[in-house]
Structures are given as structure tokens and as C-alpha cells.
Amino acid sequence: MMDQARSAFSTLFGGEPLSYTRFSLARQVDGDNSHVEMKLAADEEENVDNNMRGNHASVPKPKRCNGFICYGTIAVVLFFLIGFMIGYLGYCKRVEPKAGCERPTGTEALGTERTEPSETEEYFPETPSRLFWTDLKTMLSERLSNTDFTNTMRWLNENSYVPREAGSQKDESLALLIENRFREFQLSKSWRDEHFVEIQVKSSNAQNTVTIVDMESDLVYLAESPEGYVAYSKATTVTGRLVHVNFGTKKDFENLKSPVNGSLVIARAGKITFAEKVANAQSYNALGVLIYMDQARFPIVNARIPFFGHAHLGTGDPYTPGFPSFNHTQFPPSQSSGLPSIPVQTISRAAAEKLFENMEGDCPSAWEIDPSCRLETSSNKNVNLTVNNVLKEIRIFNVFGVIKGFEEPDRYVVIGAQRDAWGPGAAKSSVGTALLLELARIFSDMVLKGGFKPSRSIVFASWSAGDFGAIGATEWLEGYLSSLHLKAFTYINLDKAILGTSNFKVSASPLLYSLLEKTMKDVKHPITGQSLYRDSNWINKVEKLSLDNAAFPFLAYSGIPAVSFCFCEDTDYPYLGTTMDLYENLNQKIPQLNKMARGAAEVAGQLIMKLTYDLELNLNYEMYNDRILSFVRDMNQFRTDIKEMGLNLQWLYSARGDFFRATSRLTTDYKNAERTNRFVMREINDRIMKVEHNFLSPYVSPRDSPFRHIFWGSGSHTLPALVEHLKLRQKNKSAFNETLLRNQLALATWTIQGAANALSGDIWDIDNEF
């Protein structure tokens, strides 16, 4: 058959036997085996020679005119087809309709097959057309101006979903509703995960009580049987004299004239978390803690309003420290070191005033406190505190929705809000949840109808059990500890975003400072119309993320840059954590609530767009140069002490210098990078997004010291702890531990050096003589 075909083809081109070889017209892609056979001159000569030898006869050469004409015709046709295909494909890329170039139903593009895209093609899809930044800002603003946030807040505070304590039926119902909303918004995907965690609640069989004991008459007076409580308090009974410790900060305890050893203490709410107040009291050997809301700071008319909090000096489920509480997890018999060993209870202002009636000594005027305040109980009076809280296992749901990125879907920014609340939770959880839902709807609409094509993915998260120490968020982080820092590059927290109108406050990782400054310059205050950027010195006013902020575990535990912001006043919002945290009270306190919500949504929205729009990640790694330099300056104050121990700071100076050079080199690499080369840009972005994670100390266990960040974490491995330890040598040398100090200095230095090495890139690019 082949011989016959060859003979016929030979006859067609002048009767000359021909030989062919395979030659690809185009570069082979994904194993394409399409070829055109071309005649080779060498083969022709060899074939002629063979024929002459085989036949022993001379064969006259045929005329070649017809063959040249055919070859020319084929070449012209081929060049025409190739030109047509190049023009067609170029037109497709420029026009970019929704589903590629339109073609009749059931047909495919010429010369293509129905094959699955290769992994490389799927990982780096074709670059979508990009809108200008000004167009995106306008698109976001227009959609925000047509959004009624207060309507969403209102239905979140309907009786169907209030109160919604973590694990309750109403909390679960709202979780399912949010998941359905994500589906209605046509997000790329929505899902939920469940955790089984232990929380502490009030006992249904025994009351918590605070009583006054008259030691002379043995009479006992009930001050209060509080409705509120503090989760994770030790369940026990203690009796002793009562001492006022102002807010219960470390400085407050240091300034006390009366010792609290063997006594109960009473502290005002505010300034620091309940857990920190209890930890400070415990460090001074107090027996127990009472917390109340004074009228000077919390001007609530009703003096009997109960309130709630937790005393766990940490985040997540304290009975599964460092590992996730999924249903299949085999829970070891362990608990967090942050659990208190003393009882703690919230009391109403009315109960506190009863206690003050049995105390003596005026409180210092510097405290700026109610005139009824007294310092300590009289010599013949004691206070008895009984806490009967019990543990309860609950199931909680975290709900997620994602808009997948068009170029790097495996890199994502996470935006989240707490869903649960003890009490109505209007300001505490409804505001954040409303912002989350509306932003998910708006961004989905921008993608589906507005032409916005984010390069990276946007994940929307609704957390449960936030009131018990960001349990939902922390358990999720623990569940994906080994991979999240490689994928999630920023967390934006929406909790308590609107508590007032006067100020705009931010707590964030230094990596986000530059992005925040750009955003503040772009966004106007919803009421005054002035730029949110008012002070060039704003960075020095940034507050550290607190333990009760859901952004804290992202930064300190997982090493993911995080930001939390709020419109608020200089004073505390009075109803947080109380039964008066109602929508009506929030709307009364902030009459222009909808405008403020639009402003908060615009801040979050611009952050999201900037983080998913630009080629380079908007994370300013150079900001940590200032942080490291500040630490080195602090250490220089103790050069004499360090020298007396036979140590020096040369290694620290070297590590600091290497980090500075690494940041400079990365900046140079970025400036010289080819923007259209996605592989190069991705490699640079990967180095940037790992900076925060590289400051997690690799020398401590996530289980024993979960907050491993040397700048923002807690524990002896942190840089602030190292400085405090050196201060202790000057104040109380007998309490100083030189062996610990040597370890602290060495491990801190190596952590900074490791961060510098990682930022430098490949090992052959690391240039240091450490």
C-alpha cells in the first residue's frame, strides 16, 4: 500500500522517486506531533545513485518545472494559513470576550483538540485585560454608595439571630444563612468547616456570688449574684481583703502602696484585656479578680448592666493548644499555659459601689475615676468570691467564600469577621458581619459584571467563637499551619470597625504601613470629607494588636501580615460585651451609621483591590529595617552589662546588616525584573510574602509557645522579653538568669539572620560572613 502511494505521488511530481524527512513547521507545544514532510536534496541524490546501481541502466533526468510550481503553491498556501492563524489569535487576545473568542456552538478553534489544560497553563492562565486603578476605585465607590449597610445590620440583630453565643442554634442558623448568601452572590466557591471545642459557661445548678463578710459579727452580705461571667475562670471559692488596682496594668500594680499578696483585687474594665488583668494579678499572688465598668469611662445609666469576657491569655481552644480541634483529632490531656489559676468574675457598677461602701482610702485623682471609688476594705471586712463555671463542648462552624484570582488563584488575601456574640452583639459582631457580606456581594458583582479581574484570590471568612478568644480563626490557622503562610499573604479584620466617628485608628503589621498610608490618602472621612491621612507621624501612633483581636493569631501565630482598623472615639464604646449592645443603641450613638459603614467598607475594599491588583505584593518589607534598628538601639543601652558577661553585640550588628542588604537587593531585583515574566515576578513575590513568617522563632514549639513572632508574640523568645530581662539585671540582679539571657540573645540573633538569608533568595545569592 505504501509503495503504491509512493509511486503515485512520485508520478504526480514528474515520475521521480522522492525521499522525505519530518520537519516541524511550528514549535511543538504539549507533545503536538503535527508535521510536514519536506524533500531533502541529499536523499534525492542518494536515491538516484541507488536506482542507477540497482538497474544498471542510465535513466534520463525528468523535467522539474511542474514540481517547482507545486512546491511554490503549497508554500504560499501555508504562509497564508499561518498568517491568518496569527492574526486570529492576536485578535482573540485583544478582544477577550467573557468565554474566549466566540465561535459556533459545538465547534472548536481550528487545529485544536478538546484536551485538559496542562498544569503550567492552569497555574498561569492568560493575562486578563486590566482596568485602570482609577476605574476600579470609581467602580467600588459607586457600588458602596448604593448599599444600605444598616439594613443588613438590622436583620442580623433580629430575634431570629440574637443572642447567638458560640455553638448555639442561632449561631449555627446564621452560619448556614451566610453560606447561602455566598452562593447567591455567585462566588467561585463557598464552604464551611466544623470544629469541636470546649468553652466555659455559667453553671445551671449553682450561682456565681460575691459577698461581703463582717469578721466581727460573722454576718455575710450578698453584694451580687452576677448575670455576666468570665469564661475560663478557675471554678473555686476564695476569701480575703479587697484592693483596688485601677485598670490592673503592670504599671498599676507596680505603683500600689498596699500589697495584694493573699488578697482579692478589683479592677476597672478597659485599657487591656481581661486576660492580661488576671495574669498581672496572678503574678502578684492575688487570690482572685473582680472587674467592673466605672461610670467615668463607661457612662451607662443602668448601673446593673451585666457584661462578659474571657480570661484565657491566648487564642483558640485552650484545651487543644497548638493543634486543631477537628472531630477526628485525638485530644491529648493538655491545656494552655494561658489559663488562669485564680477565679475571676465581672460585676455590675451597682455591686462595685456596694463594695466601696465597705472600703476605705480615696483613690488617686490621677486615676480620673468615680468619686465613690475606694482603695481597700477596712480591717474587719473581707470579700468572698465563688465561681461555679463549667466546661461545655460545642460544635462551631467557620463559613468561607472565595473569588478565585485570574492569574495566581493559589495566593489569597483573607477578610474576616466574628459572627457570634454574648448578648445582641450589634457593634461587636453585626457590624463586621454586615461589612463582610456586602463586600462579598460587591466584589462578586465587580468581577461578574464590572470587568474586575483580580490577579489573586479573595477569601471571605465568618468566624465563630470569637468571644472566647478568636477560637474559630485560631483553630483554622492551626489546622493549616504548614501551608497557610505559603498561600495567605494578608488578613483584614472587620470586627468592631465602627465604634464612633471622630478618629480612624489602625493596628497592623509594619509590612502594611505603606499600603495603609496610600489608602488613607485615597479615602475621605465619611462625614467631614477630609482625607483619613492627617498626620505624617501616624506610624508612631499605631497600637499593637491585642490578644482579643482576631488579627493577632494571624500575625503572631502564623506569621501572616494582618490589619485591624476602626472608626472610634478616644473613649471606649460603652456597650461592648453587654446586653445593651443593641442595634438601636449603636444607631443612636452613631446617627450616620450607614455613612460610617461605607467609609469602613471603602478602606477594606481598597486594601483588597491593591493587594490583588498590582503585580508586586503591596508589602513593604523595608519597614522591618526600622524595627530591627530600634531593637539594636535598645540593646546598645546595655552594652556595659553585656560586656560584663563576656558577650558582645557584633553578631547582632552583622545580622541586622545582612537583613538591610537583603532588602536592598530585593528592591534592586524588583526594579530590574521584567514585569511580563510571571515566573520572575512570582519568585520575587514569594520572597516578599514570607518575610513575616521568617520572624517566627524556629527555636520554640508552636504548642508550648504558640505566638512565636519575635516582635509581636509572647514569651522569652521575643525581642521585648530580651530587653526586659536585661532591665531586670539592673533592677534585681538576684532574679536575673544569665544562662537564659545567653540563649535569648543567640536565638534572637539567629532568627534575624535566618530572615535575612531567606529574603536574599537562593542559597548561592546569600552573601554574608556571619
Curated annotation (Swiss-Prot):
A motif (Cell attachment site) lies at residues 656-658. One of its GO terms (biological process) is intracellular iron ion homeostasis. A lipid is attached at residues 65, 70 (S-palmitoyl cysteine). The modification Phosphotyrosine is found at residue 20. Residues 1-70 are cytoplasmic. The chain crosses the membrane at residues 71-90. Glycans are attached at residues 107, 261, 327, 384, 732, 737. Residues 91-770 are extracellular. Residues 579-770 are annotated as: Ligand-binding. A motif (Stop-transfer sequence) lies at residues 61-64. Its main location: membrane. InterPro entries: PA_dom_sf, PA_domain, Peptidase_M28, Peptidase_M28B, TFR-like_dimer_dom, TFR-like_dimer_dom_sf, TfR1/2_PA. Keywords: Cell membrane, Disulfide bond, Endocytosis, Glycoprotein, Host-virus interaction, Lipoprotein, Membrane, Palmitate, Phosphoprotein, Receptor, Signal-anchor, Transmembrane, Transmembrane helix. A motif (Endocytosis signal) lies at residues 20-23. It comes from the Eukaryota. GO terms for molecular function: transferrin receptor activity. One of its GO terms (cellular component) is external side of plasma membrane. It is a single-pass type II membrane protein. Cellular uptake of iron occurs via receptor-mediated endocytosis of ligand-occupied transferrin receptor into specialized endosomes. Endosomal acidification leads to iron release. The apotransferrin-receptor complex is then recycled to the cell surface with a return to neutral pH and the concomitant loss of affinity of apotransferrin for its receptor. Transferrin receptor is necessary for development of erythrocytes and the nervous system. Positively regulates T and B cell proliferation through iron uptake. Canine and feline parvoviruses bind human and feline transferrin receptors and use these receptors to enter and infect cells. This is Transferrin receptor protein 1. It comes from Canis lupus familiaris (Dog).
